[in-house]
Amino acid sequence: MARVKRGVTTHARHKKILKLAKGYRGRAKSCYRIALQRVEKALQYAYRDRRTRKRDFRSLWIIRINAAAREHGLTYGRFMHGLTLAGIDLNRKILAEMAVNYKDDFAKLVETVSGKLAESS
């Protein structure tokens, strides 16, 4: 039976890790064992932060909507409640976009919501 040497696969694996570690500082970019540790940690951070990013953006959208709503005399909670009463189904991402880039349209939306809130109370 022929002897199997694993030089080719080992070299390929090392190359793959060192390619992923490109741009790292110090020996983390050139020494396989250290690069492997740094790459594994980087992948853990990436996995975690893909989930964190969703939370961060939702928070950012809420902050922007709240700021824009308060300029028109409503709080975020009252504004969102008014949207529900008015039957307007816009998500927070779109509302934040409107609040930042389409201020006139957002103002009209606040007027509509204010009317619905006045009717309900």
From Swiss-Prot:
One of its GO terms (molecular function) is structural constituent of ribosome. The keyword Magnesium does not apply. InterPro entries: Ribosomal_bL20, RIBOSOMAL_L20_CS, Ribosomal_protein_bL20_C. One of its GO terms (biological process) is translation. GO terms for cellular component: ribonucleoprotein complex; ribosome. Keywords: Ribonucleoprotein, Ribosomal protein, RNA-binding, rRNA-binding. Signal peptide: none annotated. The keyword Lyase does not apply. Binds directly to 23S ribosomal RNA and is necessary for the in vitro assembly process of the 50S ribosomal subunit. It is not involved in the protein synthesizing functions of that subunit. Belongs to the bacterial ribosomal protein bL20 family. This is Large ribosomal subunit protein bL20. It comes from Wolbachia pipientis wMel.
